[in-house]
Amino acid sequence: MANPKNTAALQELKARFEEADATVLTEYRGLSVVETTELRRALGQDVTYSVAKNTLLKLAAKEAGIEIDESLLTGPTAVAFIKGEAVDAAKAMKAFGKDHEAFVVKGGNMDGAALSAEQVMAIADLDNRETTLAKLAGALQGSLAKAAGLFNAPASQVARLAAALQEKKD
């Protein structure tokens, strides 16, 4: 019979995998409790950072239908369960990793696809959703202003032509 403590942990991890929009596996060996708390604070409220046994992570991910590269499940592993914007969490991890050499991103999962550590760090270099939408809105606004100018140009040319014809008749 399975250990009730492990069964409860498995169900909790499975629920977190199912609720998360993305997950990032990290190695926390060499980080103090203070540093881990600092990382949790940097990740924000939309991210749950949990230390778990590799066997439980493997089983929970499988039960939740999440693809994880099993080669990442070696050594001490912690998982960042990200709800919402993965870019912000990846940026926080990248910044934390610059200041703490012991912190290592192993890889992760986003939109049902397994990610390598390099891919997770590449996500950190992207703009977040709000910034991307603001840039798109700015580009559209500029394009709409140009389009309005183009649409108004023929009308003003017709008006000038009509005025010239009227003057000629008079």
Swiss-Prot record:
GO terms for biological process: translation. GO terms for molecular function: large ribosomal subunit rRNA binding. It comes from the Bacteria. It holds the Pfam family Ribosomal_L10. The keyword RNA-binding applies. GO terms for cellular component: ribonucleoprotein complex; ribosome. Keywords: Ribonucleoprotein, Ribosomal protein, RNA-binding, rRNA-binding. InterPro entries: Ribosomal_uL10, Ribosomal_uL10-like_sf, Ribosomal_uL10_bac, Ribosomal_uL10_bac_type. The keyword Ribosomal protein applies. Forms part of the ribosomal stalk, playing a central role in the interaction of the ribosome with GTP-bound translation factors. Part of the ribosomal stalk of the 50S ribosomal subunit. The N-terminus interacts with L11 and the large rRNA to form the base of the stalk. The C-terminus forms an elongated spine to which L12 dimers bind in a sequential fashion forming a multimeric L10(L12)X complex. Belongs to the universal ribosomal protein uL10 family. This is Large ribosomal subunit protein uL10. It comes from Corynebacterium urealyticum (strain ATCC 43042 / DSM 7109). The gene is rplJ.
